[in-house]
Amino acid sequence: MFNVCPDCGEYRADKIIVPEGAYAVCPNCGFQHRFIRLPLFILTGASGVGKTTACLALAAKLKECVVMESDILWRDEFNQPATDYRNYRETWLRVCKNISQAGKPVVLCGAGVPAQFEQCIERRYFSNVHYLALVCEDETLTSRLRNRPAWRGSSKDEYVEEHLKFNRWLIDNAQDTQPPMTLLNTAEITVDESVAAVERWIHSHLNGE
Protein backbone atom coordinates (compact mmCIF):
# COMPACT_ATOMS: atom_id res chain seq x y z
CA MET A 1 0.00 0.00 0.00
CA PHE A 2 2.40 2.69 1.20
CA ASN A 3 5.09 1.90 -1.36
CA VAL A 4 2.81 2.94 -4.24
CA CYS A 5 3.13 6.66 -4.96
CA PRO A 6 -0.29 8.40 -4.84
CA ASP A 7 0.88 10.85 -7.51
CA CYS A 8 2.73 8.88 -10.22
CA GLY A 9 1.60 5.37 -9.26
CA GLU A 10 5.13 3.91 -9.20
CA TYR A 11 6.00 1.22 -6.66
CA ARG A 12 9.11 2.37 -4.77
CA ALA A 13 10.26 1.00 -1.43
CA ASP A 14 13.32 3.27 -1.49
CA LYS A 15 11.56 6.55 -0.76
CA ILE A 16 13.66 9.38 0.63
CA ILE A 17 12.91 10.29 4.22
CA VAL A 18 13.05 14.03 4.93
CA PRO A 19 15.03 14.99 8.06
CA GLU A 20 12.02 15.59 10.30
CA GLY A 21 10.58 12.24 9.26
CA ALA A 22 7.10 13.49 8.41
CA TYR A 23 7.35 12.82 4.68
CA ALA A 24 8.61 10.10 2.35
CA VAL A 25 9.61 11.48 -1.04
CA CYS A 26 8.99 9.40 -4.18
CA PRO A 27 12.34 9.02 -6.05
CA ASN A 28 10.45 8.90 -9.34
CA CYS A 29 8.36 12.09 -9.24
CA GLY A 30 9.32 13.89 -6.02
CA PHE A 31 5.87 13.64 -4.46
CA GLN A 32 5.98 14.07 -0.67
CA HIS A 33 3.89 11.39 1.00
CA ARG A 34 3.04 12.22 4.61
CA PHE A 35 3.49 9.27 6.96
CA ILE A 36 3.87 8.41 10.64
CA ARG A 37 7.39 7.39 11.62
CA LEU A 38 7.31 5.29 14.79
CA PRO A 39 9.75 2.99 16.59
CA LEU A 40 9.71 -0.77 16.05
CA PHE A 41 10.34 -3.30 18.81
CA ILE A 42 11.94 -6.67 18.00
CA LEU A 43 11.60 -9.41 20.62
CA THR A 44 14.08 -12.11 19.63
CA GLY A 45 15.63 -15.25 21.07
CA ALA A 46 16.16 -18.95 20.50
CA SER A 47 13.26 -21.37 20.40
CA GLY A 48 12.20 -22.19 23.95
CA VAL A 49 13.15 -18.94 25.69
CA GLY A 50 9.55 -17.73 26.01
CA LYS A 51 8.91 -15.48 22.98
CA THR A 52 5.54 -16.96 22.04
CA THR A 53 4.34 -16.99 25.64
CA ALA A 54 5.35 -13.36 26.05
CA CYS A 55 3.77 -12.45 22.72
CA LEU A 56 0.40 -13.91 23.71
CA ALA A 57 0.41 -12.11 27.06
CA LEU A 58 1.58 -8.79 25.61
CA ALA A 59 -1.08 -8.84 22.90
CA ALA A 60 -3.74 -8.84 25.62
CA LYS A 61 -2.07 -6.27 27.88
CA LEU A 62 -0.13 -3.82 25.73
CA LYS A 63 -2.95 -1.80 24.18
CA GLU A 64 -0.70 1.05 23.01
CA CYS A 65 1.15 -1.28 20.61
CA VAL A 66 0.31 -3.94 18.05
CA VAL A 67 1.97 -7.22 19.05
CA MET A 68 2.65 -9.80 16.33
CA GLU A 69 4.33 -13.20 16.02
CA SER A 70 6.60 -13.31 12.97
CA ASP A 71 6.12 -17.04 12.30
CA ILE A 72 2.60 -16.42 10.95
CA LEU A 73 4.05 -15.24 7.62
CA TRP A 74 6.71 -17.94 7.23
CA ARG A 75 6.51 -19.86 3.96
CA ASP A 76 8.97 -22.12 2.14
CA GLU A 77 9.60 -19.32 -0.36
CA PHE A 78 11.28 -17.32 2.43
CA ASN A 79 13.71 -20.12 3.30
CA GLN A 80 16.69 -18.43 1.63
CA PRO A 81 19.73 -18.77 3.92
CA ALA A 82 22.02 -17.57 1.11
CA THR A 83 20.47 -14.09 1.44
CA ASP A 84 20.21 -14.32 5.23
CA TYR A 85 16.42 -14.42 4.76
CA ARG A 86 16.38 -10.87 3.39
CA ASN A 87 12.99 -11.12 1.65
CA TYR A 88 11.39 -12.37 4.86
CA ARG A 89 12.75 -9.41 6.85
CA GLU A 90 11.77 -6.91 4.16
CA THR A 91 8.25 -8.32 4.09
CA TRP A 92 7.87 -8.03 7.83
CA LEU A 93 9.23 -4.49 7.93
CA ARG A 94 6.79 -3.53 5.17
CA VAL A 95 3.90 -5.04 7.15
CA CYS A 96 4.99 -3.25 10.33
CA LYS A 97 5.39 0.05 8.47
CA ASN A 98 1.85 -0.13 7.14
CA ILE A 99 0.39 -1.12 10.51
CA SER A 100 2.18 1.77 12.22
CA GLN A 101 0.36 4.23 9.96
CA ALA A 102 -2.63 3.71 12.28
CA GLY A 103 -0.57 5.43 14.99
CA LYS A 104 0.58 2.44 17.03
CA PRO A 105 4.11 0.99 17.04
CA VAL A 106 4.58 -2.72 16.41
CA VAL A 107 6.19 -5.29 18.72
CA LEU A 108 7.44 -8.13 16.51
CA CYS A 109 8.22 -11.43 18.25
CA GLY A 110 10.49 -13.88 16.45
CA ALA A 111 14.07 -14.99 15.93
CA GLY A 112 16.36 -12.47 14.27
CA VAL A 113 19.34 -10.19 14.88
CA PRO A 114 19.98 -6.50 14.11
CA ALA A 115 22.15 -7.18 11.04
CA GLN A 116 19.19 -8.89 9.36
CA PHE A 117 16.92 -5.87 9.80
CA GLU A 118 19.23 -2.86 9.73
CA GLN A 119 20.38 -3.53 6.14
CA CYS A 120 16.83 -3.67 4.78
CA ILE A 121 15.42 -1.01 2.47
CA GLU A 122 12.28 -0.81 4.60
CA ARG A 123 14.29 -0.01 7.76
CA ARG A 124 14.31 3.73 6.90
CA TYR A 125 10.62 4.07 7.75
CA PHE A 126 11.13 3.60 11.52
CA SER A 127 12.46 6.23 13.91
CA ASN A 128 14.32 3.52 15.83
CA VAL A 129 14.41 -0.25 16.00
CA HIS A 130 14.89 -1.60 19.51
CA TYR A 131 16.00 -5.19 20.14
CA LEU A 132 15.32 -7.30 23.23
CA ALA A 133 16.77 -10.83 23.28
CA LEU A 134 15.28 -13.39 25.65
CA VAL A 135 17.94 -15.86 26.81
CA CYS A 136 18.48 -18.55 29.43
CA GLU A 137 21.07 -21.09 30.57
CA ASP A 138 21.85 -24.15 28.45
CA GLU A 139 20.31 -26.58 30.93
CA THR A 140 17.06 -24.64 31.14
CA LEU A 141 16.75 -24.28 27.37
CA THR A 142 17.52 -27.96 26.77
CA SER A 143 14.87 -29.00 29.29
CA ARG A 144 12.25 -26.70 27.78
CA LEU A 145 12.87 -27.92 24.24
CA ARG A 146 12.89 -31.61 25.12
CA ASN A 147 9.67 -31.32 27.13
CA ARG A 148 7.62 -29.62 24.44
CA PRO A 149 4.72 -31.47 22.73
CA ALA A 150 5.94 -34.00 20.17
CA TRP A 151 4.32 -32.21 17.21
CA ARG A 152 6.79 -29.35 17.56
CA GLY A 153 9.73 -31.63 16.83
CA SER A 154 11.98 -29.68 19.18
CA SER A 155 13.40 -32.62 21.13
CA LYS A 156 15.72 -33.78 18.36
CA ASP A 157 19.41 -33.43 19.17
CA GLU A 158 20.23 -31.30 16.12
CA TYR A 159 17.33 -28.93 16.84
CA VAL A 160 18.35 -28.51 20.46
CA GLU A 161 21.99 -27.88 19.53
CA GLU A 162 21.03 -25.33 16.87
CA HIS A 163 19.07 -23.25 19.37
CA LEU A 164 21.62 -23.64 22.15
CA LYS A 165 24.18 -22.23 19.72
CA PHE A 166 21.96 -19.25 18.82
CA ASN A 167 21.19 -18.62 22.50
CA ARG A 168 24.91 -18.58 23.36
CA TRP A 169 25.60 -16.27 20.40
CA LEU A 170 23.03 -13.77 21.67
CA ILE A 171 24.55 -13.79 25.16
CA ASP A 172 28.09 -13.36 23.83
CA ASN A 173 27.38 -10.75 21.15
CA ALA A 174 24.43 -8.65 22.34
CA GLN A 175 26.62 -5.66 23.19
CA ASP A 176 28.54 -5.79 19.92
CA THR A 177 25.64 -5.67 17.45
CA GLN A 178 24.57 -2.43 15.80
CA PRO A 179 22.49 -1.33 17.57
CA PRO A 180 23.22 -3.33 20.74
CA MET A 181 20.57 -5.72 22.03
CA THR A 182 19.19 -5.74 25.56
CA LEU A 183 19.22 -9.17 27.23
CA LEU A 184 16.52 -10.63 29.47
CA ASN A 185 17.30 -13.93 31.20
CA THR A 186 14.05 -15.87 31.60
CA ALA A 187 15.53 -18.84 33.47
CA GLU A 188 14.92 -17.70 37.04
CA ILE A 189 11.76 -15.60 36.66
CA THR A 190 8.11 -16.48 36.20
CA VAL A 191 6.17 -15.92 33.00
CA ASP A 192 4.38 -12.95 34.58
CA GLU A 193 7.70 -11.45 35.66
CA SER A 194 9.12 -11.94 32.18
CA VAL A 195 6.12 -10.25 30.55
CA ALA A 196 6.31 -7.37 33.04
CA ALA A 197 10.01 -6.90 32.26
CA VAL A 198 9.29 -6.75 28.52
CA GLU A 199 6.53 -4.21 29.16
CA ARG A 200 8.91 -2.02 31.17
CA TRP A 201 11.49 -2.20 28.40
CA ILE A 202 8.96 -1.14 25.77
CA HIS A 203 7.57 1.68 27.90
CA SER A 204 11.06 2.98 28.67
CA HIS A 205 11.71 3.44 24.96
CA LEU A 206 8.26 4.82 24.19
CA ASN A 207 8.72 7.44 26.88
CA GLY A 208 12.15 8.29 25.51
CA GLU A 209 11.13 8.63 21.87
Ranges and model annotations:
Residues 43:
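Hydrophobic anchor at the beta1->P-loop junction of P-loop NTPases
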Residues 51:
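Conserved lysine of the Walker
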Residues 5-8, 26-29:
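Short cysteine-rich clusters marking metal-coordination/redox-active sites
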Residues 151-197, 209:
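Small-molecule kinase domains that catalyze NTP-dependent phosphoryl transfer to phosphate-bearing small molecules
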Residues 48:
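Walker A (P-loop) phosphate-binding loop of P-loop NTPases
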Residues 87-129:
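Glycine-rich phosphate-binding loop used to anchor ATP phosphates in small-molecule kinases
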Residues 125-147, 184:
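Conserved phosphate-donor/acceptor-positioning beta-strand/loop module used by diverse small-molecule
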Residues 55-97:
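Conserved substrate/cofactor phosphate-moiety recognition/catalytic segment
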